Amino acid sequence: MIPLLYFVLPTLGSYVMLSIFFLRRPHLLHTPRAPVFPIRLAAHRGGSGERLENTMEAVENSMAQRADLLEFDCQLTRDGVVVVSHDKNLSRQSGLNKDVNTLDFEELPLYKEELEIYFSPGHFAHGSDRHMISLEDVFQKFPRTPMCLEVKERNEELIHKVANLTRRFDRNEITIWAAEKSSVMKRCRAANPEMPMAFTIWRSFWILLLYYLGLLPFVSIPEKFFFCFLPTIINRTYFPFRCGWMNQLSATITKWIIMRKSLIRHLQDRGVQVLFWCLNEESDFEVAFSLGANGVMTDYPTALRHYLDKQEEETQPPQPEALSCLSLKK
């Protein structure tokens, strides 16, 4: 047993040292990738806290706040139109208990006059525009705006239509594939491999496991975006479980596992942008950026823009005029 320890302990120690060394210096093993478009402000569902979600009015409002990224979910109508809609069933959004794929585009109902904001329970969004929009309409109006498109189910027709629309509008590099399931992402990637992709849920767990095993520096990462919920919003604005104690437990565990500056910094050094979602309060903005996140996804683009502008003003050096005034006062 003792001779075995003489071999195991030095080997383990060397492995730990190498892992830490390359975790901090991944450029020695991997070619650095510069982000095509930096993201600070991402608008969730087009900015669903200030206008009705996924409407053109919401998108225009977000763009007025200089949003860097628009996030949408895609569904397919009966007549083959890709529409921007979070839900497949329309009952929550419109009161009509029908699926999007059972209606033609022209038959889609109006949104309700107010919709509860999922990540701000008890708060409701309103707007004068209640029309559902097609992805093509958004591409036409904002041809050079980066967008993240989530496909929720393995629908080959939907995936290929999204891929072809992206090609037709020559926006492969600024349109992100997103999916919860790896099986769906595999098909998205096959339909248009030129589009960058975000981590799926399984891939996110896998990356975390590799990080804690010390293997992450030695593994390739094809994804360019890591969209992750901020653990501090669990049991406050985000309730993944019905039981309160489960939410509290998950908040504690995920806070310990995910909120690691060294992990975020390593991913960024590998060319992966890290964004936390879906944050709607200034205190959460502060936590996310203090961890080193590239950006934040929010329902309230105006609130996040005010926060970012305020932070920029505080970090800017004093202007010459201000310095001269101070010297005169002295």
Curated annotation (Swiss-Prot):
Its main location: membrane. Keywords: Cytoplasm, Endoplasmic reticulum, Hydrolase, Lipid metabolism, Membrane, Metal-binding, Transmembrane, Transmembrane helix. Highly expressed in stomach and kidney. In stomach detected in the glandular epithelium. Predominantly expressed in the stomach (at protein level). It catalyses: 1-hexadecanoyl-sn-glycero-3-phosphocholine + H2O = 1-hexadecanoyl-sn-glycero-3-phosphate + choline + H(+); 1-O-hexadecyl-sn-glycero-3-phosphocholine + H2O = 1-O-hexadecyl-sn-glycero-3-phosphate + choline + H(+); 1-O-(1Z-octadecenyl)-sn-glycero-3-phospho-N-hexadecanoyl-ethanolamine + H2O = 1-O-(1Z-octadecenyl)-sn-glycero-3-phosphate + N-hexadecanoylethanolamine + H(+); N-(5Z,8Z,11Z,14Z-eicosatetraenoyl)-1-(9Z-octadecenoyl)-sn-glycero-3-phosphoethanolamine + H2O = N-(5Z,8Z,11Z,14Z-eicosatetraenoyl)-ethanolamine + 1-(9Z-octadecenoyl)-sn-glycero-3-phosphate + H(+). Residues 23-200 are extracellular. Residues 1, 222-330 are cytoplasmic. GO terms for biological process: N-acylethanolamine metabolic process; phosphatidylcholine catabolic process; phospholipid metabolic process. It is a multi-pass membrane protein. SUPFAM superfamilies: PLC-like phosphodiesterases (SSF51695). Residues 311-330 are annotated as: Disordered. InterPro entries: GDPD-Related, GP_PDE_dom, PLC-like_Pdiesterase_TIM-brl. A divalent metal cation binds at residues 71, 73, 86. The keyword Isomerase does not apply. Pfam families: GDPD. One of its GO terms (cellular component) is perinuclear region of cytoplasm. Residues 39-308 form the GP-PDE domain. Belongs to the glycerophosphoryl diester phosphodiesterase family. PANTHER family: LYSOPHOSPHOLIPASE D GDPD3 (PTHR42758:SF3), PHOSPHATIDYLGLYCEROL PHOSPHOLIPASE C (PTHR42758). This is Lysophospholipase D GDPD3. It comes from Mus musculus.
